[in-house]
Curated annotation (Swiss-Prot):
Pathway in which the depicted protein is active: Carbohydrate acid metabolism; D-galactonate degradation; D-glyceraldehyde 3-phosphate and pyruvate from D-galactonate: step 1/3
An example Gene Ontology biological process: amino acid catabolic process
Molecular function (Gene Ontology), one example: magnesium ion binding
Active site (catalytic residues): H185 (proton donor), H285 (proton acceptor)
Domain of life: Bacteria
Protein name: D-galactonate dehydratase
Amino acid sequence: MKITKLTTWRLPPRWMFLKIETDEGIVGWGEPIVEGRARTVEAAVHELGDYLIGQDPARINDLWQVMYRAGFYRGGPILMSAIAGIDQALWDIKGKALNAPVWQLLGGLVRDKIKAYSWVGGDRPAEVIAGINTLRGMGFDTFKLNGCQEMGMIDSSRTVDAAVNTVAQIREAFGNDIEFGLDFHGRVSAPMAKLLIKELEPYRPLFIEEPVLAEQAEYYPRLAAQTAIPLAAGERMFSRFEFKRVLEAGGLAILQPDLSHAGGITECFKIAGMAEAADVSLAPHCPLGPIALAACLHVDFVSYNAVFQEQSMGIHYNQGAELLDFVKNKADFNMEGGYFKPLMKPGLGVDIDEDKVIEMSRRAPDWRNPVWRLADGVVAEW
């Protein structure tokens, strides 16, 4: 079998799909994307395609190493996201060729189901009570919300109180009937994170995500030393080499690699094993589309340390398309009691409606995250 063609489509709300074709008629689907940089990743995918045309798609490990190492400059969000989507598609092809789901090729199931959690609220933590009530009616009991609005490097007591009050209201409304993680989204400086985490501790959030930016990862062990709340990060780390340094330093209780950013299934399977060896949990980041989610689930179901899975159904970013709008086999993604079951079809197990992909690609937006500014006019972290 040989690879013959790569085709990409930019899609609403902020996704990109990749189809890899072969001379035997088997195709694989992937989801390479950096949200807000789709055209840049698309160019990288087709540059990497020069290494792939005419090659055997079954040689996933070799092709991965060629894409990563054949260029003198490597790593980073654009290249690793391009590799990630290609890698997903190659695993999809291999599974279809062997008539087996990807989790079977990775050694078989280690669990029967995986807890899903849902985003609630928008970019800023408001109207979350109503959102949680709606999602509970859909079977969710685990959530994630933005833990604070934009925050200065040294900010006011009012800003801290606003964040804490939101969390207090959630606990008052629902008690311990639900669990929720708080995403600081890299908006918080180390001094403010230290203060905010301390104030939030009585409400026992499930985790705090990106308490500081990955660029300030040296603060993870320092912040962890002062709190019992598990700290999580990883969506802006792009290879096992970055995760190696974080694991060696300590501080994180949960790693959150993104299967569409951190090199795909091949790389994230290795990251999961590294985390297990360090007694660190795995919760893949996935506010993206159905192919990315399918890739996450295959890694979840073969990783002992996977604890829950993010998914984007109803997320505030989904303007113009929802999680399963491009999927024919929607029922395979049904959750039972807030849990995903393994995908059983060969390959990634997601049947993409190509006609709809082509149609919707004609009106794909060039999505960008908003640019925020603080009161003094300085650019704020989004």
